[in-house]
Curated annotation (Swiss-Prot):
The active site is at residue 63. Its main location: cytoplasm. This is Protein-L-isoaspartate O-methyltransferase. Belongs to the methyltransferase superfamily. L-isoaspartyl/D-aspartyl protein methyltransferase family.
Length: 218
């Protein structure tokens, strides 16, 4: 999509993402095209491609581009997956998942954010996305199992419903830790036993709280 932000998008990919080690060509190509500035308030459009998160209202944020790329890369998407996203937020991460997977199911607890994200995603033609308003820590049982699950808010621990809804061999990426700083963790389910998991620490991060039954209390 050619627009006045095209050069900023390409610079973002080169200096913030490729330069920091995310080299997946599908991610780089998609992030070179997705108009991130449409997912923030118009007054912040000129800051959309900077290396930092931005407020999107309701005390929520759009993550910095590098973190979006890093988390997406950890999901190891090939193009045919069914993906669950917890925390639609602005819809930018959702759009990237829609570019890289076959089906995306996204849950957002704040109705105004969910509705705005749906509007933008429809405007951009992402029709392989379903959005539901509710408590994302329960997952989306009727659509499970999922090949990959991405959580875009910090949890005190791994919500067990998400492990239960993950395919064997499926990947779950989420921030786990305190309310102000977390570790970004990749969890791979190894068998039918929901306790048989491989966990990898991808580094420190800061996310808003995951609010819900299996997260933080509101």
């Amino acid at each position: 999509m050619m627009d006045r932000f095209q050069k900023q998008r390409l610079r973002m990919v080169d200096t913030q993402i490729r330069a920091r080690g995310v080299l997946n060509p599908r991610i780089l190509e998609a992030m070179s095209r997705i108009p991130r500035h449409l997912f923030v308030e118009e007054a912040l459009a000129d800051q959309a491609y900077n290396d930092n998160p931005l407020p999107i209202g309701d005390m929520q944020t759009i993550s910095q581009p590098y973190i979006v790329a890093l988390m997406t890369d950890a999901l190891d998407l090939k193009g045919r997956e069914k993906v669950l996203e917890i925390g639609t937020g602005s819809g930018y991460q959702t759009a990237l998942l829609a570019e890289l997977a076959d089906q995306v199911f996204s849950i957002e607890r704040i109705a105004s954010l969910a509705n705005n994200a749906r509007r933008i995603l429809d405007q951009l033609g992402y029709y392989n996305v379903a959005i539901r308003i509710g408590d994302g820590t329960y997952g989306w049982k009727e659509e499970s199992p999922f090949d990959a699950i991405l959580v875009t808010a910090g949890a005190p621990d791994i919500p067990m419903p998400l492990i239960e809804q993950l395919k064997i061999g499926g990947r779950l990426v989420l921030p786990v830790g305190g309310r102000h700083i977390q570790d970004l963790v990749k969890v791979t389910r190894l068998s039918e036993d929901i306790n048989e998991l491989k966990k990898e620490n991808l580094g420190g991060c800061r996310f808003v709280d995951l609010i819900g039954e299996y997260g933080w209390s509101g």
